[in-house]
Amino acid sequence: MPRALVTGAAQGLGSEIARRLTGLGYEVVVHGRDAARTEVALAAAPGAVGSVTGRLDSLASTRLLADDARGRGPYGVIIHNAALGPDEPRQVFTEDGLDRVLQVNVVAPYLLSALLNLPRRIVFVGSDAARAGRPLVDLEVPQPWDGHQVYADSKLLLTMLAFELAARHTDRPINIVHPGWVRTRMGGPRATLPLSDGADTPVWMATSDEAVARRGGQYVHKRRAEAAPPAAHDATLRAALVDRLADLTGEHLR
């Protein structure tokens, strides 16, 4: 079976995705942001073949993570699940001078995509909050800062990144999935979907041979392609975003 890398696999959706992939026979490598979380991720996915550890709110740490992950590949599937949620209480700037939500949710997936060998499939875990996002292609957050708005912004930018990568590699399924409002630590107890339902479409897009799962450049919910936010289809905006990310990281998408 193919090897799969799942970021943010210590809890919630990422943990369930990793567990289900191992159950399907995939050779899963799990990621946690520190040693303790990585151990939790391994325990939650019996049968995982390896792990990588690294913070995504640091360019240096993300580079080391990519080096480690590359040595544990190659991968047939990469699932970019790790993210900060909408309930961050205040704006935090990272050691790289970036808004922490944007760095974890957008810059880190870009850098990993630029540094890792391209797998056969990529699944980005997005959110329908992207529809309320602003295309902040310069990665500068207007004030006053609002956690829910910046989360929405980050998920729109991630959708744009997924569509740009898909446009560059039309020979493989590269997609973004909106899993729904899932009862996780991020989603909260009032969320409408159990964890198993939230993980269903990301896992299906990573593994299925059905037509939707074999196409790229889609915004997928409940195993169906839906209309993406308009900015995802704007090639000029997407180019501006990846140019900014390339300048920031010094790495270019293939």
Regions found by a protein language model. Give the residues of each.
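C-terminal helical subdomain
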Residues: 192-243, 247, 251
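Conserved glycine-rich cofactor-binding loop
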Residues: 10-11
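Catalytic loop of short-chain dehydrogenase/reductase
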Residues: 83-91, 99, 121-171, 178-191
